[in-house]
């Protein structure tokens, strides 16, 4: 479904790709006055203008690239068209966050706001649910704002809406699955801080606005957090201050902090990576996993033939060099076998890393943040 459809060269090129692959597609259009003008929305001049999506199953899952993509609008449009064809259809949504039956200011729900800071989503008490049941539940602004449209759609189609509130229409049992609230709170707090660091870097890259940063700062303040509450960030900053050069730190699953500093041979992320593998493998810190004579030819290749100005090895080059060393060195082989243990570890760099380093660490499952 191509939502908010307008014919442009890029859209037409995308449609041609879909045609070439035999993928059916449908157009949904902008509706003037959406979402306030309910009488127009739920009419042939509103949803009626959209293409009818042909389906052959009794249960259809609507998914999309991300928030604000038009999932709910697609469902409501389809309800309108199904009814016109004499088919009685219903709608429910599965959405994990915010969690409706925990506190509005629980770190998990604040983390959801942090995750959607670019959309400016705001968690709020569901006023419809409170009025209907006298029960306080948590929802968010977009669902609360669209509920009158959903209710009017059901009222017009079936004469009655089966839902009395946005919370009613959701399927979410996540809150009942929490058995260690302190662990959940800590994980949520770390997510809030990660979102802040990532947004700061995205701002430098031109991918985030000042308003997004301001909102994340406010959320951190409301949660009683600061950047030093991220242990690896604190340690990386201390090492940079001590050495006067970029530094990195990683918190292993058992809580051990391992650091890495910039040298003539390795960038801070590469040094930290090797040091972490040593710790996990129980190898002494003074053992060299990669001989300097292995690193030197790689540096010469980078500078003399590939046009690089920085001779230091990135993480991908470091892992390739470690793999070569592992052929004849049992300790290097042992260290290489520890890579899977880095998954879900928290890492921070005191500077923004090159994209290649970010990609490697992401593939390893490391939760990276950077200062900028």
How would you describe each model-predicted region?
Residues 265-281:
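A short, polar/charged loop-to-alpha-helix boundary motif
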Residues 1-63, 78-230, 234-237, 245, ...:
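Flexible phosphate-sensing "switch/lid" loops adjacent to ATP/NTP-binding sites
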Residues 288-308, 317:
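Active-site pocket-lining segment
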Residues 74:
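Hydrophobic positions on the alpha1 helix immediately C-terminal to the Walker A/P-loop
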Residues 284:
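Long C-terminal interaction/binding lobes of large macromolecular proteins
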Residues 66-67:
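The conserved Walker
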Residues 261-262:
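Short clusters of small/polar residues that mark proteolytic maturation junctions
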């Amino acid at each position: 479904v191509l939502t908010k459809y307008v014919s442009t060269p890029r859209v037409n090129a995308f449609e041609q790709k879909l045609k070439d692959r035999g993928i059916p597609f449908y157009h949904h259009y902008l509706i003037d006055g959406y979402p306030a003008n309910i009488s127009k929305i739920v009419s042939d001049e509103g949803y009626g203008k959209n293409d009818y999506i042909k389906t052959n199953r009794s249960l259809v899952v609507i998914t999309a690239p991300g928030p604000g993509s038009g999932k709910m609008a697609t469902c409501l449009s389809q309800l309108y068209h199904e009814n016109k064809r004499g088919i009685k259809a219903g709608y429910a949504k599965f959405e994990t966050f915010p969690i409706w039956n925990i506190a509005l200011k629980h770190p998990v729900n604040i983390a959801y706001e942090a995750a959607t800071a670019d959309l400016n989503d705001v968690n709020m008490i569901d006023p419809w649910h409170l009025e209907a049941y006298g029960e306080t539940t948590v929802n968010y602004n977009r669902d609360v704002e669209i509920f009158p449209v959903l209710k009017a759609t059901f009222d017009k189609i079936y004469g009655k809406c089966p839902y009395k509130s946005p919370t009613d229409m959701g399927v979410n049992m996540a809150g009942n699955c929490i058995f260690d609230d302190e662990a959940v709170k800590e994980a949520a707090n770390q997510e809030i801080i990660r979102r802040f660091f990532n947004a700061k870097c995205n701002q430098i890259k031109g991918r985030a606005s000042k308003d997004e940063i301001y909102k994340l700062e406010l959320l951190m303040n409301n949660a009683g957090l600061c950047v030093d509450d991220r242990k690896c960030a604190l340690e990386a900053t201390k090492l940079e201050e001590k050495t006067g050069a970029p530094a990195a730190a990683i918190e292993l699953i058992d809580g051990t902090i391992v650091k890495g500093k910039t040298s003539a041979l390795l960038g801070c992320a590469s040094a930290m990576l090797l040091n972490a593998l040593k710790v996990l493998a129980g190898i002494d810190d003074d053992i060299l996993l990669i001989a300097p004579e292995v690193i030197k030819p790689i540096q010469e290749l980078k500078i003399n033939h590939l046009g690089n100005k920085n001779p230091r090895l990135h993480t991908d080059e470091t892992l390739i060099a470690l793999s070569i060393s592992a052929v004849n060195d049992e300790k290097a082989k042992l260290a290489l076998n520890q890579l899977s243990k880095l998954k879900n570890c928290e890492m921070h760099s005191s500077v923004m890393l090159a994209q290649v380093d970010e990609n490697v660490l992401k593939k390893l499952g490391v939760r990276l943040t950077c200062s900028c």
